[in-house]
């Protein structure tokens, strides 16, 4: 006997449609270095539909790779949805990779177009002759940076001009939820970077996981500051989760200095701010004596959070850092260190010790530690080590 529940593809289009329908008045704010640019979800939706038309006009293949070389901005968010919602594949390029690695992944992914921020175009320009199949180069003018003279024969198209020439279009239906939606390359292995391809289904499921209370708990009332780059494991899922819930988004742009981020947290009343430990080391002294009462969560990953750093935040802001763990291959949320009801009864020092751990494996994921080179689990006693294996709805 089968159930009677309906079955519909789990696609990123649904995330976009919900934001457009229910949260059009909510804001996406981008820091430009000289001020703030504000747009609403309604405006974002219209521009994203125009961008879909741009991809058609440029002749990008039905499942073509659309690359970005960009900071966290509203424009980057438009690309996050225009590419997969039209059946194409978003490929976020890590701006901090070595030149030879960038050449490898652009060619390996077969990128047809790269959308690049003006402020970092100079990093990309010398590599253009090495990109074998690149058809188009689109400039997103963030107001700074010289335009190199030598672009290897590419005409530099202007993002805003392209959008202005298009009308908003309807997205095609994505019939197969397992269709590729985006891809990131991880350099955390031996040899060349490895490509991780996320599906519509996996992204949808990971977005739901990010909304769970025992995970990142993203919700409509949040004001989310993703300091973690959008080219790093999908900004830890916060870009999709914010759009899915209608949370306000604060995009930091190129200036990730302690003073700039502290100002955004305080002035925009940020509730969730996510970044790596080095970011929070720089931000902490800039928050001293300021009103941080809006903050409810500081997710942190990428490397182990020092106990001293988490405790410094707890003592100064009343809020310890929330350690999480994951990889590009896990989309990336795999565990979040929330203390359970019994652990919250422990002493302050004991709780601080526990917060140095990565927490419990997230709902939807199975994990085990096995003996190296085998499938034999090690004894679960807190002492044995081995190789970690994960599987689940958003695990590559």
Predicted regions located by residue number:
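Flexible, low-complexity linker/hinge segments
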Residues: 1-10, 125, 145-180
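N-lobe entry segment of adenylate-forming
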Residues: 1-58, 62, 86, 133, ...
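Structural core segment of the AMP-binding/adenylate-forming
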Residues: 15, 57-58, 85-164
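Conserved AMP-binding/adenylate-forming core of the ANL superfamily
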Residues: 28-73, 77-81, 98-103, 155-161
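Conserved adenylate-forming
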Residues: 55-60, 166-179, 183-225, 237, ...
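Adenylate-forming
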Residues: 71, 116-126, 142-143, 228, ...
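Conserved AMP-binding/adenylation subdomain of ANL enzymes
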Residues: 204-223, 231-271, 286
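Conserved AMP-binding/adenylate-forming
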Residues: 298, 305-324, 328-396
């Amino acid at each position: 006997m089968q159930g009677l529940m309906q079955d519909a593809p789990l696609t990123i289009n649904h995330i976009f449609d919900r934001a457009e329908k229910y949260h059009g008045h909510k804001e996406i704010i981008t820091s430009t270095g000289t001020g703030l640019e504000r747009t609403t979800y309604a405006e974002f939706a219209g521009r994203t539909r125009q961008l879909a038309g741009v991809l058609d006009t440029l002749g990008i293949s039905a499942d073509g790779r659309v690359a970005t070389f960009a900071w966290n901005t509203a424009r980057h968010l438009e690309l996050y949805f225009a590419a997969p919602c039209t059946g194409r594949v978003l490929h976020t390029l890590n701006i901090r990779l070595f030149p030879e690695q960038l050449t490898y992944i652009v060619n390996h992914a077969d990128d047809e177009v790269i959308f690049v921020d003006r402020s970092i175009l100079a990093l990309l320009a010398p590599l253009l002759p090495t990109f074998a199949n690149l058809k188009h180069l689109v400039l997103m003018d963030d107001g700074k940076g010289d335009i190199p003279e030598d672009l290897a024969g590419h005409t530099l198209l202007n993002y805003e001009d392209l959008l202005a020439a298009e009308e908003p279009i309807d997205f095609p239906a994505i019939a197969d939820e397992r269709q590729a939606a985006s891809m990131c390359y991880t350099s955390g292995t031996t040899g060349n970077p490895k490509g991780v391809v996320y599906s519509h289904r996996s992204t949808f499921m990971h977005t739901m996981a990010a909304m769970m209370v025992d995970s990142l708990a993203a919700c409509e009332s949040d004001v989310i500051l993703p300091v973690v780059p959008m080219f790093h494991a999908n900004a830890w899922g916060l870009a999709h989760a914010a759009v899915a819930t209608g949370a306000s988004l604060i995009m930091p742009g190129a200036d990730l200095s302690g003073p700039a981020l502290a100002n955004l947290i305080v002035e925009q009343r940020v509730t969730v701010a996510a970044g790596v430990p080095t970011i929070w080391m720089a931000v902490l002294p800039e928050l001293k004596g300021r009103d941080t009462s809006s903050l409810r969560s500081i997710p942190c990953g990428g490397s182990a959070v020092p106990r001293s750093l988490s405790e410094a935040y707890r003592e100064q802001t009343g809020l310890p850092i929330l350690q999480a763990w994951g990889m590009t291959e896990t989309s990336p949320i795999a565990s979040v260190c929330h203390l359970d009801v019994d652990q919250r009864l422990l002493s302050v020092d004991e709780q601080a010790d526990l917060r140095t751990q990565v927490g419990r494996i997230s709902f939807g994921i199975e994990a085990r530690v096995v003996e190296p080179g085998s499938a034999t689990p090690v004894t679960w006693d807190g002492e044995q080590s081995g190789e970690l294996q994960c599987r689940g709805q958003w695990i590559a």
